[in-house]
Amino acid sequence: MVNTPVPGLGSCASRGLIAAPASIIRSRPGCDHAGECIVVCVGVFRKDWVMTSPKQRPPLVPGVAQTFPVLPLRDIVVFPHMIVPLFVGREKSIRALEEVMRGDTYILLATQENASDDDPATDAIYRVGTLATVLQLLKLPDGTVKVLVEGVTRAQVVQYTDRADLYEAEAISLPDEVGDVVEAEALARSVVNEFENYVKLNKKVSPEVVGVVGQIEDHAKLADTIASHLAVKIPEKQAVLETVKVADRLEKVLGLMESEISVLQVEKRIRTRVKRQMEKTQREYYLNEQMKAIQKELGDEDGRDDLQELEDRIKRTKLTKEAREKATHELKKLRQMSPMSAEATVVRNYLDWLLSIPWGIKSKVKKDLPFAQSVLDSDHYGLDKVKERIVEYLAVQSRANKLAGPILCLVGPPGVGKTSLGRSIAKATGREFVRVSLGGVRDEAEIRGHRRTYIGSMPGKIIQSMRKAKKSNPLFLLDEIDKMGADFRGDPSAALLEVLDPEQNPTFNDHYLEVDYDLSNVMFVTTANTLNIPPALLDRMEVIRIAGYTEDEKAEISRKHLIPNALQKHGLSAKEWSIDDAALLQVIRRYTREAGVRNLEREISTLARKAVKELVISKKKSVKVTAKNLETFLGVPRFRYGEIEREDQVGVVTGLAWTEVGGELLTIEGVMMPGKGRMTVTGNLKEVMKESISAAASYVRSRSVDFGIEPPLFERRDIHVHVPEGATPKDGPSAGVAMATTIVSVLTGIPVRRDVAMTGEITLRGRVLPIGGLKEKLLAALRGGIKKVLIPEENAKDLADIPDNVKNALEIIPVSRMDEVLHHALLRHPEPISWTEQPVSGAVVPDEDAAGVVAH
């Protein structure tokens, strides 16, 4: 606030008056004198101010209408006790001032509703104003007038007179209504406290005002004083002026201040944030300029800048037309950006990715068929079908100029060499090898990349792997393709449809690159443990099954690969440690039971570690592992080799099962007990296997007389069928013939041969239907010491894929009906009986449902 000294009157503060707040005092240079303006009130008034004569003015009588000249105001509300300098330019306003000077009366200061109206109508002027006295008046050469007025009291306009030369109105003075003094005092204290906070936030209000406001004891004057300093809209100030009750006026002022303080706090936060950002930008600019200066001093100014280097890379790279246009456009956009902007970093990273992947850079594919065959044979023993397919592909490549890369899917249990086979194929063909693990991938963006709109976005695994390979015709090994999942982010297996389709992958489009990239020269090899793959994806691949290894193959793999690797890893020589054939066979048979060779490798490594320990501690020259001392190194054998059971038993049948890790022997047990004809099945069996047991039971019951079983026996006995290892879920129909054999053995009391295993699905008519996974099941039978295996007759054609050593070691008998199964599996064939149905005296109500099967 500025206290303006008035000659002969002293300062505003000394007279208990208030000057116009600095927040609303402003100059209007070049004003066209079309209306009143507020001028800056600083320093001492000029000597050419005309002082009003100190005549006795007529007294103001509350409630009595008196006539006063009216001075319409723009953009300001004058409160009582407020001293304001005004700039007057309108004719009517000047005449009103002259009228006041002649009669030495009060002038009514009323704010007009529309500040842009030069000649407002009487109904466009607020009805409540302030009666004021003219303290000083200054006439300017151009006819305008500067005047200093002092507010005295509020007044309500009753009506305007008909004078045309000036505004004149009859008005009633409005005295303040004090009301509840205690309430007013409480509000006054709150208003003063809030005003202090307001002044701290609003730099346009002088801090000296707080001291002046704190000394005001009159609550009405306090409200008017603070209201005059608030930077609020004219209607809000007018509402304060029109409030006669002091308590209500203080409450309105308090509400306006709280609203303004909230806005000022937000403004302060914004200013602080903007200032901090500007300081950061200026600091980065300063540091960058310093770095450039340092580089110049070091002699690096001759080096080309990043943009020039990017332009040269675009020219050198063999981009497609689409990619070149995209790169040129992005480079042009980068040139127009500030180097420090975040968008520039995004564009620079994009160009770096686009230019880093190989465009038309191929490695020379080897077409030497004998070399490829020798590489595959040296790295892997067996796997003839896979090797044959690879050599066929190379043979076609040697004759044809262009051939879309084959997409092979190697399916087999863990540990059979699927992943290492992919590396060998790359070595045999002379391609770069890239492995992409898909296990656990659930996001489609992992394959196709993220769009550049995301922060930290990058290409998908395909483009990343191409950048790693640095060639456009590598070998891609997509590992564990059956372990992908799908969730709300998309299905990655659907994204792979484009990658693995030779018709689509020449125009593979990554979300990040946004340009087509040719994947037709890439050779894709995928691996999986099962064929649990979406049909559309499976249709795009050539499936090659890799079954488990035979004992002979495992022994050969151990001699060629596992034992030499163990010697190298443990720092041993062939003279220091060796294992004879009998011991190696014992390790395979009695310490491992798997389709692959991973556990076998672990056992061989254990033997090597034991040998190193013996050589170091006992100072021996060499350690030889034999069948006699094998248990000294590896402990008690973990598995039994030979007959699955030690003797032929009633109701115990050996079935064959397929699992993800290869084939397994499946023991099925059955017992009969007195009861009411119920059948119970246990062993964590799933729905398909339960239905298979029901079908087997119905078949046996329908043929009971042929098997020498009296039909009433089914209603007097309960049968319980159990499959051990209850913690392992079991499902599938291939154990149907084994279930039927178990039930027949239990009901007839005929033992089952312990050296016979069987597999096949049974129908209600006793037919044996084909099954899958025959090779894995036969290998499991061979590992378990089985002599005779019964298989469905329709699976006999699959024996062509079975190794000769397996077929020679097993007696494989194809069967088509259940009678043949019982002939080979039971010690003796059941003898049929003659049975005549006895008449039933009354209806029999069964205790259980029609199926009679209870599963626990």
UniProtKB/Swiss-Prot annotation:
Which Pfam families did the record assign? AAA, Lon_C, Lon_lid, LON_substr_bdg
Which reaction(s) does the protein catalyse, per the Swiss-Prot or TrEMBL entry?
Hydrolysis of proteins in presence of ATP
Q: What InterPro entries does this protein's entry cite?
A: AAA+_ATPase (IPR003593), ATPase_AAA_core (IPR003959), Lon_bac (IPR027543), Lon_bac/euk-typ (IPR004815), Lon_lid (IPR054594), Lon_proteolytic (IPR008269), Lon_Prtase (IPR027065), Lon_prtase_N (IPR003111)
Hydrolase as UniProt keyword: yes
SUPFAM superfamilies given for it?
P-loop containing nucleoside triphosphate hydrolases (SSF52540), PUA domain-like (SSF88697), Ribosomal protein S5 domain 2-like (SSF54211)
Report the residue ranges that make up the Lon N-terminal domain in this protein: 68-261
Which of UniProt's keywords are assigned here? ATP-binding, Cytoplasm, Hydrolase, Nucleotide-binding, Protease, Serine protease, Stress response
Q: What CDD domains does this protein's entry cite? A: RecA-like_Lon
User: Which residues participate directly in catalysis?
Assistant: 734, 777
- State what induces this protein: By heat shock.
* One cellular component (GO) term of this entry: cytoplasm
Looking at its record, which EC class is this enzyme? hydrolase
EC numbers on record: 3.4.21.53
Matching SMART domains, A to Z?
A: AAA (SM00382), LON (SM00464)
One of the GO biological process terms: protein quality control for misfolded or incompletely synthesized proteins
The main location is: cytoplasm
- Reading the lineage from the top rank, the first entry is Bacteria
* Protein localization: Cytoplasm
Q: Which PROSITE patterns would you find in this protein's record?
A: LON_N, LON_PROTEOLYTIC, LON_SER
Assigned protein family:
Belongs to the peptidase S16 family.
Which PANTHER family does the protein's record reference?
ATP DEPENDENT LON PROTEASE FAMILY MEMBER
Instruction: Provide the protein name.
Output: Lon protease
Gene label: lon
